[in-house]
């Protein structure tokens, strides 16, 4: 049986482990979550007011959110960064990784988790790039949205990290044989 108080206490402890202070809690008992925003609009307004009053820098949700939910909630909260429990846990692992391999593994896990949620992160991810303007590999092509560009960069980083990790694994295997 899910215990709301215990889960929120654990979430507050996770925030603390990530050097964040939980300044308010907004809960709602619903049969089914609101599809696009998880909370009802009244509770979301309550959360927005609390966040503004307390100067919150981030809203942490106790559960997994989709990219569109992150975007919708962030918009309703006045552009506040929105993360879910899993992202918070991955951030904790990333910040505590010590070895080079551990750092690469946690960055890879975080990128793989964030990739399908990119549409909800940051602002104006749907803006289109213009054409022209010579050179520059990181530029957007004509009609390429910022979201598409971000996805391309994340895919490239994921590929590079996976390659580095495979290389490390191969070297470790070779040194064991020697």
How would you describe each model-predicted region?
Residues 1-90:
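N-terminal accessory targeting/assembly segments
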Residues 121, 125-178:
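Conserved G1/Walker A P-loop phosphate-binding module
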Residues 2, 32-37, 96-102, 139, ...:
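Flexible beta-alpha connector loops of hexameric P-loop NTPases
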Residues 87-106:
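Short alpha-helix plus adjacent loop in nuclease-associated cores
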Residues 98, 105, 109-112, 116, ...:
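Short amphipathic alpha-helical segments with heptad-repeat character
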Residues 64-78, 104-113, 130-139:
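Short secondary-structure transition/capping segments
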Residues 12, 16-19, 52, 74, ...:
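Signal for well-folded cores of large energy- and translation-related assemblies
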């Amino acid at each position: 049986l899910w215990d709301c108080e215990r889960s929120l206490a654990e979430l507050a402890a996770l925030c603390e482990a990530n050097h964040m202070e939980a300044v308010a809690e907004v809960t709602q008992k619903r049969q089914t979550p609101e599809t696009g925003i998880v909370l009802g609009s009244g509770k979301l307004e309550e959360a927005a007011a609390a966040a503004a009053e307390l100067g919150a820098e981030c809203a942490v949700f106790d559960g997994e959110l989709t990219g569109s939910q992150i975007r919708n909630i962030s918009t309703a909260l006045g552009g506040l960064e929105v993360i879910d429990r899993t992202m918070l846990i991955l951030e904790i692992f990333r910040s505590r990784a010590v070895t080079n391999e551990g750092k690469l593994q946690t960055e890879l896990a975080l990128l793989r988790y964030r990739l399908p949620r990119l549409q909800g992160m940051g602002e104006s991810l749907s803006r289109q790039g213009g054409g022209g303007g010579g050179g520059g590999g990181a530029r957007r092509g004509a009609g390429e949205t910022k979201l598409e560009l971000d996805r391309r960069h994340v895919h490239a980083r994921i590929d590079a990290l996976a390659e580095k990790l495979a290389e490390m694994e191969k070297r470790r295997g070779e040194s064991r044989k020697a």
